[in-house]
UniProtKB/Swiss-Prot annotation:
CDD domains: BRCT_DNA_ligase_like, LIGANc
Xref: PROSITE patterns: BRCT, DNA_LIGASE_N1, DNA_LIGASE_N2
Essential cofactor(s): Mg(2+); Mn(2+)
Record HAMAP family: DNA_ligase_A
Protein's name according to its UniProt entry: DNA ligase
Entry's family note: Belongs to the NAD-dependent DNA ligase family. LigA subfamily.
Residue span(s) of domain BRCT: 586-667
A cellular component term, taken from the record's GO annotations: cytosol
Active-site residues annotated for this sequence: 112 (n6-amp-lysine intermediate)
Chain residues that bind NAD(+): 32-36, 81-82, 110, 133, 167, 283, 307
Organism (species): Staphylococcus haemolyticus (strain JCSC1435)
Origin: domain of life: Bacteria
One GO biological process term: DNA repair
Encoding gene per record: ligA
Length: 667
């Protein structure tokens, strides 16, 4: 036994050293095959002698047991956000304020990694807990997923107790591999590496997180008690010494001019990195000066984040492709010469509608400027007319549907062209794809390509047909083995139990979104009651307007739709609301039964987190301000919704007021 224990310790040391060289120093001393061989040996020993497996064994990198949920945990000290600067003038104002308060100052400039903020707690040198930022006060415990990231040391060589914070991210190479795998499996690819990293760390199965090949850069120490560092740069050097991965592109500068030079450099060179950045973080380097300056309620006064402007690139517009949505809207898409924009290769970009094409005089063959709105959605900004080839013609939208050849119409008050043929194949297929989507019936494994095959082989013609599928229908399809078919049929069976709001949203009734589906399902409880509802009844409901009421009643009165519902009932698809009713939520009197709108950029929590918390308090969170809105919570750069709220005399809170009320209720 002594020899086995000794070998286990030796394997720990070797694997930790080789992992540090590969994942932190990026300078491996042994080939991957040697690392894999040693890891396999350790796994075999631990399986034969589980008494020798420790919580910080290198084998935890492959992932442990599936978790049922992520526990909410309070941060020892809040994980605050940073104030933003978008131009040189705002940076100079920040510098002036700093110097007025503390005098002479040195700055530490660091790359702002585009990932997910995490907090890692070490006790006596061992990694014991990892949290997401959450709302800044409370995060989710994702310890088991973070253990799979090789760049996070499970144990350090000194028995120190402290908290270190950083950014978990997905390298571009991992992102490309992951999306290739998703496309191969007919799954929706991630929009960008940031979303991929966040989604990976929220997997309940750590083994899935382990496969995603995430990394991390650590950038701050929360408690300096066990550290000799007196500066931010010194703290990062100390983290380096202890074996943590920090970003070595950081730079100390003596004044704001040095900051601006650093920003200029990385604005030009960001694409040369192997990971995404979305800005530069500027911090006062001296920790005593940081303490002197202190914090606002939401951010440190001694730091600011400079956000890069949306990157614009020039490429050639090769064609304009038209797609038909499930409601018949014809959407033009630019087909481009592939070009890298904000970290990903773009070959398609939105053109929105016919009016935009004409306003910007965009023509096939033009050199066009492309950017990503919010660094996510590619769009064509303009044509460069001085580069326009001779003989190009203004683009004309077709008069007939490219799918069914039905005449296209423009409904009064709308900018979109629309196909109104209810038998249009493109619309029917898009409707099927919508029906199985995550927010609708959430049928995992029934992707776009499978639906297209089933439709074009006349196996399914409407959404009810999905519940009549058999093994014989699915096995002949491309890439459909018996195991995949078994899993898909189970997912279809499970979907039958979905609450009524999922079915309502999945049916694709025009103007009926997720929130309104929830409202109707909760109000009427069964599909049978909904089938009898009148427009007047619907309009009297707080969140239902005239257009939606008319659309719902017209849809449900259609005899074909009534037959479709009967067809779904025959296969025991649930037609009853089985969620929690708002009236049953205890909630808080400041929010219960109130209609609330969130607008602007929230700094201390995400829009999704704020909405979820408000709904737990019994509120209804909607997307538009009306005379029926009770409260508007306005973040930074709030626009027309705030103006509308002021016009209606609606109560308005700042984000700070909202967070203060959250803290009051939670305490």
């Amino acid at each position: 036994m002594g020899n086995i224990k000794s070998r286990v310790n030796e394997l720990h040391d070797l694997l930790n050293q080789y992992g540090y060289e590969y994942y932190v120093q990026d300078n491996p001393s042994v080939p991957d095959s040697e690392y894999d061989k040693l890891l396999r040996e350790l796994i075999d020993i631990e399986e034969a002698h589980p008494e020798f497996k420790s919580p910080d064994s290198p084998t935890v990198r492959v992932g442990g047991e599936v978790q049922s949920s992520f526990e909410k945990v309070n941060h020892d000290t809040p994980m605050l956000s940073l104030g933003n600067a978008f131009n040189e003038q705002e940076l100079r104002r920040f510098d002036q304020r700093i110097r007025e308060q503390v005098g002479s100052v040195e700055y530490m400039c660091e790359l702002k990694i585009d990932g997910l903020a995490v907090s890692l707690k070490y006790v006596e040198g061992r990694f014991v807990q990892g949290l997401t930022r959450g709302d800044g006060t409370t995060g989710e415990d994702i310890t088991e997923n973070l253990r799979t990231i090789h760049a996070i040391p499970l144990k350090i060589n000194e028995p120190l107790s402290f908290e270190v914070r950083g950014e978990a991210y997905m390298p571009r190479s991992s992102f490309i591999r992951l999306n290739e795998e998703k496309e191969k499996n007919e799954e929706q690819p991630f929009a960008n590496p940031r979303n991929a990293a966040a989604g990976s760390l929220r997997q309940l199965d750590p083994k899935l997180a382990a496969k995603r090949k995430l990394s991390v850069f650590l950038y701050s120490v929360n408690d300096f008690t066990d550290f000799d560092a007196t500066t931010q740069s010194g703290a990062l050097d100390e983290l380096d010494r202890l074996g943590f991965k920090t970003n070595h592109e950081r730079m100390r500068v003596g004044d704001i001019e040095g900051v601006l030079e650093y920003i200029e450099k990385w604005t030009k060179q960001r694409e040369q990195l192997s990971y995404d950045i979305d800005g530069i973080v500027i911090k006062v380097n001296d920790i005593e000066q940081q303490d002197e300056m202190g914090y606002t309620q939401k951010s440190p006064r001694w730091a600011i984040a400079y956000k890069f402007p949306a990157e614009e690139v020039v490429t050639t517009l090769q064609d304009i492709e038209l797609s038909i949505g499930r409601t018949g809207v014809v959407t033009p898409t630019a087909i481009l010469d592939p070009v890298r924009v904000a970290g990903t290769t773009v070959s398609r970009a939105s053109l929105h509608n016919e009016d935009l094409i004409h306003e910007r005089d965009i023509r096939i063959g033009d050199s066009v400027v492309v950017k990503k709105a919010g660094d996510i959605i590619p769009e064509v900004v303009k044509s460069i007319t001085e580069r326009r080839p001779e003989g190009t013609l203004p683009y004309s939208m077709p008069t007939h549907c490219p799918s069914c050849d039905h005449e296209l119409v423009r409904i009064e008050g709308e900018v979109a062209l629309r196909c109104i043929n209810p038998k249009c194949q493109a619309q029917l297929v898009e409707g099927l794809i919508h029906f199985v989507s995550r927010q609708a019936m959430n049928i995992d494994g029934l992707g776009t390509k499978i639906i297209q095959q089933l439709y074009h082989h006349n196996v399914i013609n409407d959404v009810a047909d999905i519940f009549y599928l058999t093994e014989d229908d699915l096995l002949p399809l491309e890439r459909m083995g018996s195991k995949k078919v078994e899993n898909l049929l189970k997912a279809i069976e499970d979907a039958k139990a979905n609450s009524l709001e999922h079915l309502l949203f999945g049916l694709g009734i025009r103007h009926l979104g997720v929130k309104a589906s929830q409202v109707l399902a909760e109000k009427y409880e069964t599909m049978d009651r909904l089938l009898e509802v009148t427009e007047e009844e619907l309009i009297s409901i707080h969140d239902i307007g005239d257009k939606l009421a008319q659309s719902v009643v017209t849809y449900l009165e259609n005899e074909d739709i009534k037959a479709l519902i009967e067809k779904l009932k025959y296969k025991n698809v649930n037609m009853v609301y089985n969620g929690i009713k708002t009236s049953d939520i205890e909630g808080h009197p400041d929010f219960k039964n109130k209609t609330i709108v969130l607008t602007g950029k929230l700094q201390q929590l995400t829009r999704k987190e704020a909405s979820a918390w408000l709904e737990l308090q019994g509120a209804k969170v909607t997307s538009s301000v009306t005379k029926k809105t009770d409260l508007v919570i306005a973040g930074e750069d709030a626009g027309s919704k705030l103006t509308k709220a002021e016009k209606f005399g609606t109560e308005i809170w700042t984000e700070e007021q909202f967070v203060a009320k959250q803290n009051e209720i939670s305490s």
